[in-house]
């Protein structure tokens, strides 16, 4: 398998083949956010800019107990709740991805259960607490994984990142973030 850092190296080379020496802009969200940051860290001269839709959890802030602004305290509470209720998938995918992979690669219902639960939990909600993603939208998103047979590979990235990932350097590329 490959880590986000290794994926970044591959994508930079592919982009250089596609656009030559012309700098390009990248955008990433979720795991792609980490990949995009590694691309910017490894090859800043190749980029005009970086757009992120996810910056991850700011882990040091979770441990801070004093001098928090209202915004930081709110972030800390929401991030802590997320860690306590929504990160079990990370532990499974980072330690036993192959066990999971059989169920999500062999059964469309297994894949829908695994991914659909996350899409439902993480999507915005209306006033009634219903997901802003329709059931059809969720099925379409899951179908992309099913049709391309990439769910096992996507799960395995967490194991690779848990064992191979190096810390990111400070970024010098112009960066925009939309949350």
Residue ranges and their predicted role:
Residues 93-179:
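C-terminal subdomain of alpha/beta-hydrolase-fold enzymes, centered on the catalytic histidine
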Residues 15-16, 40, 164-168:
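Short, flexible, glycine/charge-rich loop motifs used to bind or transfer phosphoryl groups or to couple energy/partner
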Residues 12-13, 22-26, 46-51, 102, ...:
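Beta-sheet entry/capping signal
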């Amino acid at each position: 398998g490959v880590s986000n850092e290794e994926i970044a190296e591959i994508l930079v080379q592919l982009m250089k083949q596609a656009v030559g020496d012309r700098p390009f802009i990248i955008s990433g969200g979720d795991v792609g956010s980490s990949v995009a940051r590694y691309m910017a860290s490894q090859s800043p001269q190749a980029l005009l800019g970086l757009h992120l839709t996810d910056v991850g959890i700011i882990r040091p802030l979770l441990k801070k107990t004093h001098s928090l602004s209202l915004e930081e305290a709110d972030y800390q509470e929401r991030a802590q709740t997320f860690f306590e209720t929504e990160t079990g998938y990370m532990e499974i995918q980072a330690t036993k991805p192959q066990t999971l992979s059989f169920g999500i690669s062999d059964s469309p219902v297994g894949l829908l259960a695994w991914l659909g639960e996350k899409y439902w939990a993480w999507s915005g909600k209306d006033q009634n607490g219903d997901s802003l993603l329709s059931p059809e939208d969720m099925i379409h998103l899951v179908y992309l994984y099913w049709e391309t047979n990439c769910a096992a590979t996507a799960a395995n990235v967490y194991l690779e990142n848990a064992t191979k990932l190096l810390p990111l350097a400070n970024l010098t590329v112009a960066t925009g973030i939309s949350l």
